[in-house]
Regions:
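Short, charged N-terminal helix-start/capping segments
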Residues: 28-40, 147-153, 215-233
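Short, surface-exposed loop and linker segments with low hydrophobicity and enrichment for Pro/Ser/Thr
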Residues: 78-84, 163-179, 287-297
Length: 389
């Protein structure tokens, strides 16, 4: 019994495989009610948001249930909401004297939710449970505490290359599984050059030395680009080894960028072959539009995870920890370049390598507003983002 759901009609909807749907008849007093059984077998009862059935008042659960495939002229009444996610309900024909029939519908405990506003698909998970109901500085402080409890999973500097084999593959543009380099990728046409894994600088964690193309300029090899430069935090470990903000990029462009922060460049002194701009006069670098959100979310990640930079230009020593001009531009970049499949896949791949450590802004881009822009909204845990719908 395979169901096809119209997810555009839902706010936060559970994807429930038909194999776990239980529309079992609990009371079969009248054999003439076989049609009710047929209706019940087709019903889809879904929460309109992620619900913890064990701790939520059943009355509140009922208000958050949506029913699909109920024929015109029939109605249901809820009898009981069980802590295991079972919904007991009666089904009957409207205005009929026929005795209602009782059925049970079981919702899988680890169901997946879809956020209508961002189109992110979430898997139920407790990673962010400690942030529930928080915002502002309180949310920041709790998130920093959470992230710093996870950084022990970060591995060595050489191991960054091993992470890149999983987390930074081009499955989205040329789809050729080459290394996805934000300083050379051309999202609107042919890449000026590309890197397969082995063209890295130095050795990986397996002791394998990288290769180099015999050419000058861009395209010879890639290395490890710290979005937040190492000199800003004294190269301390494990910070300098964290792939969530250290990307594989062309060595030449990396060198041209140096230790400049990313910002808006009006008068570039260098432009890479994919359009990345560097202004050495003012000491800033601007990525192409396609990756501005990725870069911005890497900076936000650094602040809520490591928060140990001594840079006096971009970072501050007290909340909000990012100077106003950068905070506003990075928010704009994140909004313009929304979380996409590259963000989601990268976040989950790195988490697998780092014993679960995640970039919260790839899971919840709204954290930028919830922490720094004083909205009335509060954080709600939907789990971890696993896909784009």
């Amino acid at each position: 019994m395979n169901k096809v759901f119209n997810l555009n009609t839902l706010a936060l909807s559970f994807l429930v495989p038909s194999s776990i749907i239980c529309a079992a008849k609990c009371d079969n007093k009248n054999a003439n009610n076989s049609y009710l059984e047929k209706i019940a077998s087709r019903l889809v009862i879904e929460p309109t948001e992620l619900i913890d059935f064990k701790s939520t008042d059943p009355k509140n659960v009922i208000s958050k249930l949506n029913v699909e495939n109920l024929p015109l002229g029939y109605e249901i009444s809820y009898i009981e909401i069980k802590p295991n996610g079972s919904v007991i309900y009666s089904l009957h024909k409207t205005g009929s004297d026929q005795e209602p029939q009782t059925f049970e519908y079981k919702i899988r405990e680890d169901a997946v939710a879809i956020d209508k506003n961002t189109r992110l698909v979430y898997k139920k998970d407790s990673y962010y449970s400690s942030l529930e109901g928080l915002n502002g500085k309180t949310l920041f402080d709790e998130l920093l505490k959470l992230q710093q409890s996870k950084i022990r999973g970060i591995k060595t500097y050489a191991y960054l290359y091993n992470v890149y084999k999983d987390a930074f593959l081009d499955k989205y543009y040329e789809k050729d599984n080459t290394i996805l380099d934000i300083y050379s990728e051309n999202p609107k046409g042919q890449d000026p050059y590309y890197f397969t894994y082995e063209f890295h600088e130095g050795k990986d964690a397996d002791g394998s030395s990288g290769k180099s193309r015999s050419k000058s300029g861009e395209g010879s090899k890639y290395n490890r680009e710290h979005i937040v430069p190492q000199s800003w935090f004294g190269k301390v470990e494990p910070t300098r080894n964290d792939a969530h903000f250290i990307f594989p990029t062309d060595k030449i462009v990396n060198n041209e960028r140096g230790n400049y922060p990313h910002y808006i460049v009006k008068n570039p002194t260098f432009i890479s072959r994919n359009g990345t701009k560097v202004d050495k006069t003012n000491g800033i670098c601007e990525p192409i539009d396609e990756f501005k959100g990725d870069v911005a979310r890497a900076y936000f990640y650094f602040v809520v995870t490591h928060n140990n930079s001594s840079s006096n230009d971009l970072f501050e020593s007290s909340f909000p920890y990012i100077t106003k001009k950068y905070l506003e531009v990075y928010k704009k970049w994140s909004n313009q370049d929304n979380v996409d499949a590259f963000d989601i896949d990268r976040n989950n791949a790195i988490a697998r390598h780092y014993n679960g450590l995640r970039n919260p802004f790839s899971d919840y881009p709204e954290l930028i507003d919830l922490i720094w822009f004083k909205t009335d909204s509060k954080f709600h845990n939907k789990g971890i983002a696993i896909a784009i719908k």
